[in-house]
Curated annotation (Swiss-Prot):
SUPFAM superfamilies: ACT-like, Nucleotidyltransferase, Nucleotidyltransferase substrate binding subunit/domain, Poly A polymerase C-terminal region-like. The keyword Repeat applies. Residues 384-739 are annotated as: Uridylyl-removing. NCBIfam families: PRK05092.1, UTase_glnD. The gene is glnD. CDD domains: ACT_ACR-UUR-like_2 (cd04899), ACT_UUR-like_1 (cd04900), NT_GlnE_GlnD_like (cd05401). This is Bifunctional uridylyltransferase/uridylyl-removing enzyme. SMART domains: HDc. GO terms for biological process: regulation of nitrogen utilization.
């Protein structure tokens, strides 16, 4: 146990009267003498009731004082007393031995997390029963009595029963056992047995094995991070096992305890691992993370370790966070969480660096932790940097005052490390972090500092260097607007990372685009080679700044453009380029929205987009930025379909901007797409290919990616050979976490609504849809639904159910409203979110159709309800464009009235808006006549 914290735990004794409870147990023993089972049950009930009372008191104190570590200590102290009381009941009343033999000895020991002296409300209890070499039945009986008492109380108990010899033997060969014994505390019984274990463990296991232990623990840490998600900035973090969580702090202390033989966290100061400021950070991080974890357990009544969206707001309220303009209470809480996770990562890096200097572990593992370590111990000046030296292939300071003498060195050190491919010496990093407050207005306006920063941003490995600048606080101090979004989380299900992490990842993706070679990024890579050379810095700074104004009350695109207009002149951009950067930031969501939510075969869509982008060069830059932005949102967000939509929008717009000239005109692009299909799909004869190609309209060839075209061809052939009216093909996209249903059937005015209703009735949530009609009147619709099951077989069965429902509705055997109503009660996962319903009815987006854009909180059955409501309003849906962005649905419908005309009457437009907003706001299924 970390003895530095035990004083607070003792206060828990005010809530738990051990002496009184001991008397109560004695009274129960007298009352139930000769009835052991009745006595055991009575003791369990008594202790369970006492535990419930003190746990309630601990929760009340936590809500008042918000000290998580104290709460964990109180809970651990209470659990210790419970175990001591159960041991006493077993040895005094059940298996009393007045004159115990050598074999009738036992030490009850806390191990693992419980042995640390800290315990969350629903944590497992790990116990080790140490028995003598020569054992009797007594030891097994006592251990069983204790365990059954705890299990009857509903506690989760892990246990092992071993002799000292067995413990030492297992600790030598099993790192988990070794770590458990490292974190032991004596609870009850024979102290001499415990002392023997501790002494022998120290001399026979620990001595001489520090390098082995550290290597194993860091390997475990890497694997744990891989399982939990590598980034510490994932927006639903695991408080216990995630990167920057409690387990990282524990690993840090285990290593220090093993290597430096410390027993209390304050000893980390004495052995030089941390200075006073770092030790305070260690304690502050632990207290905050324990507050979060204890509140999670109390709020859920289970060992919940993941801060999922549906819990984040409740925990924020429990911890006392309030909303501020531009930031919700939950976003302020999560920003604090991610800043804490960052601090934990910094502390781990400091310890690993100290171990490296002392050569306490092998170089290969260390190399993964500290990056790019190579042999050699020579000290020499860094080229072009007299204030810095190369120390074992790491950049270090030539003198302790290099930053004070010349604050530009705070930027220069990162550029020199980047230019010379050097890692950072831990002493240099520490000094940089402590010197960041030297970055003042004068340094921010310094031309040399700004030139160096732009070199960092536009040179190789920019993401890594910027990340290191961010971790030390230099980036946020040098660009103050960036400092405001560090560790900022957006409370939605679309963005996977914090804002700063997203921006840094986008820079890495931009460099991938520039390098080329990735087929998914082919268009952006092609355009990157063709932009004007002077615009290369423009696209880099735009990518870094495009979300810089998140968390402000106003639209972040407009506010971000203002930030760029203030910032970019100091970075060396002229007025024209500054305005271009501001325009790109202001429009950075436009291309994605048009590509995914508009009919790209509608001439008006292209003309409107051309009016926004104004020139081919600006469209090139916007395409590159849009690609990096979508790809940087998180795994599975970017896909071939979105890439194809952007490509189509780009090449459809190019001739409008050039007065008819396009590097690749529309007819040529259709021909190229068809030729690509012919070359890749060699299963059919030339006449068969010609007939199949003629079945699809031009929009199909421009919008659908090659993999889906091939899949569609095989599916249509198999469908027609099978002779069924309705055919469904099922595909699985693991990267996106969706199941794709491709439906081939005779076109039907209600088909989209029927498909949407069938998905809703099966509990399937539609995340996007691609809807096409063939030249011979068949519908070919691909619907992506959120994956519900881990096994493809289970997903396949759900898809089959959806197909059966569609068939039954088309045949008139089933009414959809009845089955949809039963399933559309709402998704628990979406309940924490609030999305304001919004409906736009617009005649400027198309010359042939009225466009209805609907956005609101996604829910099961929403698309069905919308299509049914639109049909009930006597409107025909010509095309639909379905997309979800986490919890937000944005569905766009191109409609006409029943005579094929646009909706021009203001009163009718207003009625459409009212009906759809009412549907979005109230969550009720619209009545309609399907089925």
């Amino acid at each position: 146990m970390d003895l530095a914290t035990t004083n607070d735990a003792a206060g828990a004794g005010n809530d738990f009267d051990t002496a009184r409870i001991t008397g109560d147990i004695d009274a129960l023993a007298a009352k139930h003498a000769g009835h052991e089972d009745v006595f055991r049950a009575a003791v369990s009930r008594l202790l369970k009731a006492e535990l419930a009372k003190v746990r309630d008191a601990a929760q009340a104190k936590l809500l008042r004082d918000r000290h998580g570590r104290r709460c964990a200590e109180r809970l651990c102290f209470i659990q210790d007393e419970i175990i001591r009381l159960s041991f006493s009941a077993a040895t005094r009343h059940l298996y009393h031995s007045p004159i115990p033999s050598d074999g009738e000895r036992m030490a009850v020991v806390a191990t693992g997390g419980y042995g640390r002296g800290l315990m969350a409300p629903e944590s497992d209890i790990d116990l080790l029963f140490i028995l003598p070499y020569k054992q009797t039945a007594w030891g097994e009986q006592v251990a069983e009595a204790i365990l059954y008492c705890l299990w009857d109380m509903g506690l989760n108990v892990g246990h092992a029963t071993r002799s000292v010899n067995e413990s030492i033997r297992q600790a030598r060969r099993d790192m988990t056992v070794r770590t458990g014994i490292l974190e032991t505390r004596f609870l009850a019984g024979d102290r001499a047995l415990y002392d023997e274990l501790v002494t022998r463990f120290d001399t026979e296991v620990v001595q001489g094995t520090a390098a082995e232990f550290v290597t194993a623990k860091l390997a475990e840490r890497e694997e744990r991070h891989r399982r939990a998600g590598q980034s510490r900035y994932l927006v639903e973090p695991n408080v216990k096992d995630g990167k920057g969580g409690l387990r990282d702090l524990h690993t840090l202390f285990w290593i220090a305890k093993y290597v430096y033989r410390v027993h209390e966290s304050r000893e980390l100061l004495g052995c030089g691992v941390f200075d006073v400021r770092e030790y305070r950070t260690f304690r502050r991080c632990a207290d905050f993370l324990w507050s979060v974890r204890c509140n999670l357990h109390f709020a859920t009544g289970r060992a919940e370790e993941r801060l999922s969206f549906d819990l984040q707001r409740e925990i924020a309220v429990r911890l006392g966070y309030t909303s501020h303009p531009g930031m919700q209470d939950v976003e302020r809480f999560m920003k604090h969480y991610f800043l804490t996770a960052k601090d934990v990562g910094d502390l781990t890096a400091i310890l690993c660096a100290k171990l490296e200097d002392q050569q306490a572990k092998p170089a290969p593992v260390l190399g993964r932790m500290m990056s790019r370590r190579r042999p050699g111990t020579e000290l020499r000046r860094v080229p072009e940097g007299d204030d810095f030296i190369i120390d074992n292939n790491r950049i270090n300071l030539a003198a302790p005052d290099v930053f004070k003498r010349d604050p530009v060195n705070l930027i220069r050190v990162f550029r020199l490390a980047q230019k010379n491919n050097l890692a950072f010496h831990p002493d240099a990093l520490r000094t940089v972090t402590r010197s960041r407050r030297l970055i003042n207005a004068q340094l921010r306006e310094n031309p040399e500092a700004n030139r160096l920063f732009m070199e960092i941003l536009t040179s190789n490995d920019a993401e890594t260097v910027l990340r290191r600048m961010n971790e030390t606080g230099v980036l946020g101090h040098f660009i103050r607007a960036f400092g405001k979004i560090v560790s900022m989380m957006q409370f939605n299900m679309y963005h996977h990372y914090t804002v700063d992490e997203h921006l840094l990842r986008c820079i890495g993706i931009l460099q991938d685009i520039e390098r080329g070679g990735n087929d998914e990024l082919a268009l952006a890579s092609e355009l990157m080679r063709k932009i004007h050379p002077e615009h290369r810095p423009v696209i880099y700074i735009t990518t870094l700044l495009h979300d810089i104004a998140k968390g402000r009350p106003e639209d972040h695109s407009i506010a971000g453009a203002r930030v760029a207009r203030r910032l970019c002149p100091r970075l060396g951009f002229n007025a024209s380029d500054t305005e271009l950067i501001a325009w790109l930031i202001e429009q950075h969501l436009t291309m994605s929205k048009v590509a995914q939510s508009r009919d790209l075969s509608d001439r008006k869509t292209i003309e409107n987009f051309a009016a926004v982008v104004q020139s081919v060069e600006q469209m090139k830059l916007l395409t590159i930025l849009t690609t990096a932005d979508i790809r940087g949102v998180g795994p599975g967000v970017w896909n071939g379909w979105k890439a194809q939509l952007l490509r189509t929008l780009y090449y459809e717009t190019e001739p409008v901007l050039t007065g008819g000239f396009s590097e690749v005109n529309r007819v040529q692009r259709i021909a190229e797409a068809q030729a690509e299909f012919r070359a890749a799909f060699t299963e059919w004869s030339e006449p068969e290919l010609n007939a199949y190609i003629a079945r699809h309209y031009p929009a199909y060839w421009l919008k659908v990616d090659l993999a889906h075209k091939i899949r569609h061809a095989r599916f249509l052939r198999a469908s027609e050979q099978g002779g069924r009216k309705l055919n469904i093909n099922v595909g699985f996209d693991e990267a996106r976490g969706v199941t794709e249903l491709t439906i081939f059937a005779a076109d039907h005015p209600w088909l989209l609504s029927i498909i949407a209703g069938a998905c809703a009735s099966a509990g399937a949530n539609i995340v996007d849809a691609q809807i096409y009609t063939t030249t011979d009147g068949q519908a070919l619709d691909t619907i992506a639904i959120s994956r519900e099951y881990d096994r493809d077989e289970d997903e396949g069965r759900r898809a089959a159910r959806i197909g059966e429902i569609i068939e039954q509705v088309i045949d008139g055997r089933l009414r959809l409203p009845d089955v949809v109503a039963r399933r559309a009660a709402g998704k628990t996962r979406l309940r924490p979110f609030v999305v304001e319903p919004k409906v736009i009815v617009n005649n400027q987006w198309s010359d042939r159709h009225t466009v209805i854009e609907v956005s609101g909180l996604d829910r099961p059955g929403l698309l069905f309800q919308l299509t049914a409501a639109i049909s009930k309003l006597n409107l025909n849906i010509a095309s639909a464009h379905v997309a979800t962005f986490g919890e937000r649905a944005r569905d766009v419908f191109y409609v006409t009235d029943l005579l094929g005309a646009r909706i021009t009457a203001p009163t009718r437009q207003a009625a459409i808006k009212r009906a759809l907003i009412h549907l979005l706001a109230n969550g009720g299924a619209a009545e309609q006549s399907v089925g």
